[in-house]
Amino acid sequence: MEDFLRSMTMKDIGTSLISADQFVTLFNSGETVLLDIRYPFETRLWGMSFAVEIPLNELPDRLAELPRDKTIVCACPLDIRSNIACQYLLQQGFKAKILLGGLVALAERLRGGAANDLKFDRA
């Protein structure tokens, strides 16, 4: 972990962010998946049915559930825990980004009729 931290630059940090609009575009093209790293008591309250749900503390043991050919967009309610998850995934060789503003920003982006902007059928 120390070597990873020493290798980080401001460029790395800036390229790790993705907006809710950018996420929707990439999700619709099949290039990304949403990783919801909240704990079960949080996802029971409100969830994102299209997300892969892996609590942050289980992430090291469940890496095999994540595709290596897509960008993993890490998300939590804001974007605090997702920073940790993103950096961990990058260290493990995944392509990963942080959802800017977190799930709150994504929920706001998809509010009401805008929910139709997210395409689930990519046949």
What do these predicted ranges mean?
Residues 75:
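Short, surface-exposed ligand- or partner-binding patches at beta-edge/loop junctions that are enriched
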Residues 1-33, 40-71, 80-123:
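Rhodanese-like catalytic fold shared by cysteine-dependent sulfurtransferases
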